[in-house]
Amino acid sequence: MSNPISQRTARIQQATQTVFEFLTASTFARRGDEPGVSNFAIGNPHDMPLPGFVSALQQSIVPQNKDWFAYKMNEAASQATVVESLKSWRGVTFEAEDIFMTNGAFAALSVTLSTITDPGDEVIFISPPWFFYEALIVSYGAVPVRVKVNPTTLGLDLDAIAKAITPRTRAIIINSPNNPTGVIYPPDDLKALADILTAASARNKRTIYLMSDEAYSRIIFDNQPYYSPTTYYPNSLLLYTYGKPLL
């Protein structure tokens, strides 16, 4: 009898099996809710949201007109607000039409991969990674390419990244501050990465996109500066969510 699910779905299941076993059938799963146990497995907030956020959300969910069901497209006011925020906070200039609103960064990752990859394209990601990168890449028929961090610094292993690039490479996912290591990648590494991607794109006559997952970019301690990879490489896609910093 043939497999009841598609090969693509089977690959997604394989990519996530270990994680879901940990979340559902491990010591963590059995004891995670015990009093005094802190859950560091997933980047969820451990405190209730501030009252001001709750109030704003309660007001915003009131339908504005009779055609309230869902939001069918980007809203110009939201796009303009994001442009101004990025300019003042990051020093990165975008046009309003560059902004695409999604239901969180998970959806942004999914939409981006579906837009820039074709089946068989390779997508590099840094390991250890956020657990669902590989499954998302596989879900669009692309090939996940795992590159380990520098074991001493936990920073980018630039030589390994350069060696991992092939004529089929379409994108690289950079997550800074990194989940799970917490490392903020410094400007020198990001500039060197940009040079590698620029040279490889020219050599292969095919643009390699940098997907910058910046979900944790406002959760930084000890007044450390933050550097967006998008500042150094023009063929970048900045992915952001309000879900992580609005605790």
Where are these regions (language model features)?
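Short glycine-rich anion-binding loops that position phosphate/pyrophosphate groups of nucleotides
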Residues: 43-45, 176-179, 244
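Walker B catalytic acidic pair
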Residues: 214
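Conserved core of the PLP fold type I
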Residues: 66-205, 218-233, 237
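Glycine-rich "substrate-gating" loop/helix at the edge of Rossmann-like oxidoreductase active sites
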Residues: 11, 148, 181, 243-245
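N-terminal small-domain helix-loop-helix segment of the aminotransferase-like
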Residues: 13-104, 111
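Conserved PLP-binding active-site segment in aminotransferase class I/II-type PLP enzymes
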Residues: 1-19
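Residue-level marker for buried hydrophobic side chains located in beta-strands
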Residues: 210-211
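Active-site PLP-lysine loop of aminotransferase-like
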Residues: 236-247
